[in-house]
Design a protein with these regions (language model features):
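Active-site neighborhood of glycoside hydrolase catalytic domains
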Residues: 1-42
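Loop/turn elements at helix/coil->beta-strand transitions in domains of secreted/extracellular proteins
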Residues: 2-5, 32-37, 67-72, 118-119, ...
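Conserved, mostly hydrophobic/aromatic
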Residues: 7, 63, 110, 146, ...
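Aromatic/acidic polysaccharide-binding cleft in carbohydrate-active enzymes
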Residues: 36-111, 123-129
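Surface beta-strand/loop "capping" patches
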Residues: 121-145, 216-219, 225-228
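Carbohydrate-binding surface patches
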Residues: 128-169, 202
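Solvent-exposed beta-hairpin/edge-strand motifs
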Residues: 163-182
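C-terminal beta-strand-rich structural cap/linker in extracellular carbohydrate-active enzymes
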Residues: 187-219
Length: 228
């Protein structure tokens, strides 16, 4: 055990039912020995399109929320101009010198997680009222991060309740849709533990914040710890 830092796997060449069984087995094995799980390589078809990149968002959510995965890697972070598919970032060089780079929906949607859910944060328990609303939440010290995916085809307005939070609350929000990338939304201020938000169809929105104490500084939010 002392020589094993993590359990790692890919998601290739497996039927859906077999994959679910295998991932559950790895989750249970990791829990038994207190070892983190890393999913170290995978890609999705049509990942240069927004709809394809949204499929990747669903995979990230399932790995983290259902199978307790601590690190999720895409197949290729970046390559040169000779490979534009299955890359989060494509960089062009000429005679060893930088020319330009290209990013697409995959870059921005992945960033809704990677820019804000940082190493050391702990995933906390969440519940959703709809199978199209995929929500995970994370906590580190005074900061809470909520990632909300509307995987459906209809815009939604929903209430977000931070259990056991001490009002007032303050959250910033950033969103990616087919028309906007990392768009900063109006900050959210609430005098209760519940606030109402709009989640456009096929979007990912990340909220950062927590309780505001009498001095106007961010204090801890009491949410039940679930998994790392």
């Amino acid at each position: 055990r002392r020589y094993v830092g993590a359990l790692a796997y890919h998601l290739y060449d497996t039927k859906e039912t077999e994959l679910a069984h295998d991932l559950a087995h790895m989750r249970n094995l990791a829990a038994e020995y207190g070892i983190p799980i890393w999913m170290t390589e995978f890609s999705v078809p049509n990942d240069m399109t927004f709809s394809g990149a949204m499929e990747w968002m669903k995979i990230i959510h399932k790995l983290v929320a259902t199978y307790d995965v601590s690190a999720v890697d895409y197949m290729w972070g970046f390559f040169g101009a000779w490979e534009r598919n299955h890359t989060i970032l494509s960089i062009e060089f000429l005679d060893g010198k930088y020319v330009q780079h290209h990013v697409g929906p995959l870059y921005y949607l992945t960033g809704q997680f990677s820019k804000f859910v940082r190493p050391g944060q702990v995933r906390v328990e969440t519940h959703s009222s709809s199978q199209d609303l995929l929500v995970t939440a994370y906590k580190s010290g005074a900061q809470s991060v909520i990632v909300a995916i509307n995987a459906g085809q209809e815009d939604r307005r929903v209430n977000v309740t931070v259990t056991d939070a001490v009002a007032p609350l303050h959250f910033s929000a950033i969103r990616t849709t087919v028309r906007e990338f990392w768009s900063e939304l109006e900050p959210i201020a609430s005098d209760t533990s519940t606030f109402n938000v709009a989640l456009p169809a096929q979007s990912v929105t990340t909220y950062r914040g927590g309780s505001i104490d009498s001095a106007g500084t961010l204090s801890g939010v009491g949410i039940k710890k679930s998994a790392q």
